[in-house]
Amino acid sequence: MKIVICSGGFDPIHSGHIAYFRSAKRLGDTLVVGVNSDAWLTRKKSKPFMNFNERFEIVQSIKYVDYVMSFNDDDDSAILLIDNVKKAWPQDEIIFANGGDRNTSNNREAEVKGVTFAFGVGGSHKMNSSSEILKSWNN
């Protein structure tokens, strides 16, 4: 079986995230989405717009998503998430799906052995941006 991993803050979730999940699901049999903690969002952009429980529940309700996991890597990577998925599905092929804004030069997760990495999932460019949505909302 092929297990596909997506990760992100999803704060707020938008159409680009849905395209990411849809495309990622096509890569395998099971889609696992890691939702970053509020602490991670605070480090990245000062505070969450939506709290973790809201983001988790919304992601969990999306039809392409089979499992949702929480995670908080102190190094701002998704390496801990990947390790947890590898432990949960030790016999299966693991694919880490990267969105359009990621590549090999800005992907610390590529250090993890035994994982296939897919880039440009959901499109080769970023369709939408949570930060841009919030910026326009604040203005």
Predicted regions and their residues:
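Nucleotidyltransferase catalytic core that binds NTPs
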Residues: 1-139
